[in-house]
Amino acid sequence: FGDVEKAIDGCEYVYHFAGQADIGFSSKSPVESIKNNILGTLNLLELARKYEVERFLFASTIYVYSELGSFYRVSKQSCEKIIEEYQKEFGLNYTILRYGSLYGPRANDFNAMKHFLTQAIKEKKITRNGNGEELREYIHVKDASSLSITALKKQYRNQHLFITGNQQIRVKDLLKMISEIFDNKIEIHFDSNRDTHHYEITPFNFKPQIAKKIIPETFYDLGQGILDLIYDLDAKINNVNNSEILNSK
């Protein structure tokens, strides 16, 4: 806590990206997930208030629109309401960043895109829960980070922003794209046991305060973003140079 306080002292803006973000873990460990996400956020809010931070930017999720997402969604909904109340009571300005399906370098192991590509590289096959009809709007982390900086503009103060991709794709088509990148040498299997913690077509059924969607003027093409991530993951998994991967298929 002391190191965090030292880091915040003198800051104009605080981005709060820390937290437990694995939906699967949260469904099995609700106490740990809620303590981590809610109490961690409260600690940062108190420090932001103490040092009169100009604005508190919070990484939330599109799952706040949903009844899915297990205790991960519950913790993010709770944090949003707490942040809003801090603004009412103490004048601490905020911006809520509701992220969609992120992908890119340095992703956690539970990240869907990383999971797909790791399976493809290691096993030459991809197994997916569901039938592949699920719709997603993947956004590259570089685009998301750019929009997170854009969120500092005055018009986004005390606003809720919806940050997701502008290329909608079905999961089955995404997996086909990945297979084609590997010269169709990847087997694709769908498990009929649907993951009940994730949405299929849309997360919109909860009805929170409506968010504004912001999109970059230029953005990563999904195919190019996937190819770049394959190079990155293969280098880490097989300890090879990026130029070797597709030539060694």
Residue ranges and their predicted role:
Residues 2-3, 104, 194-198:
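A short acidic, often aromatic-flanked loop/helix-cap motif at beta-alpha or helix-coil junctions
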Residues 63, 101, 168:
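PG/GG-rich flexible active-site loop of Rossmann-like NAD(P)H-dependent oxidoreductases
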Residues 124-249:
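C-terminal substrate-binding subdomain of Rossmann-fold SDR/epimerase-dehydratase oxidoreductases
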Residues 1-98:
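N-terminal Rossmann-like NAD(P)+-binding domain of SDR-like oxidoreductases, especially those catalyzing
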Residues 26, 100-101, 160-163:
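Short-chain dehydrogenase/reductase
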Residues 71-73, 77, 81-136, 141-150, ...:
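NAD(P)-dependent short-chain dehydrogenase/reductase
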Residues 2-5, 24, 31, 42, ...:
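Residues in well-ordered alpha-helical elements
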Residues 44, 83, 116, 208-212:
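Structural element of the ATP-grasp superfamily
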